[in-house]
């Protein structure tokens, strides 16, 4: 895997995880 591709995948995963965490936090709390 290319380093640039890995970077984009990491950014996309972090972005999706942060959104999921915020939504889960609002629904949970």
From Swiss-Prot:
One of its GO terms (molecular function) is electron transporter, transferring electrons within cytochrome b6/f complex of photosystem II activity. GO terms for biological process: cytochrome complex assembly; photosynthesis. Its main location: membrane. SUPFAM superfamilies: PetN subunit of the cytochrome b6f complex. It is a single-pass membrane protein. It comes from the Bacteria. Pfam families: PetN. The keyword Aminoacyl-tRNA synthetase does not apply. One of its GO terms (cellular component) is plasma membrane-derived thylakoid membrane. The keyword Transmembrane helix applies. The chain crosses the membrane at residues 3-23. It is found in: Cellular thylakoid membrane. Keywords: Electron transport, Membrane, Photosynthesis, Thylakoid, Transmembrane, Transmembrane helix, Transport. Belongs to the PetN family. Component of the cytochrome b6-f complex, which mediates electron transfer between photosystem II (PSII) and photosystem I (PSI), cyclic electron flow around PSI, and state transitions. The 4 large subunits of the cytochrome b6-f complex are cytochrome b6, subunit IV (17 kDa polypeptide, PetD), cytochrome f and the Rieske protein, while the 4 small subunits are PetG, PetL, PetM and PetN. The complex functions as a dimer. This is Cytochrome b6-f complex subunit 8. It comes from Synechococcus sp. (strain JA-3-3Ab).
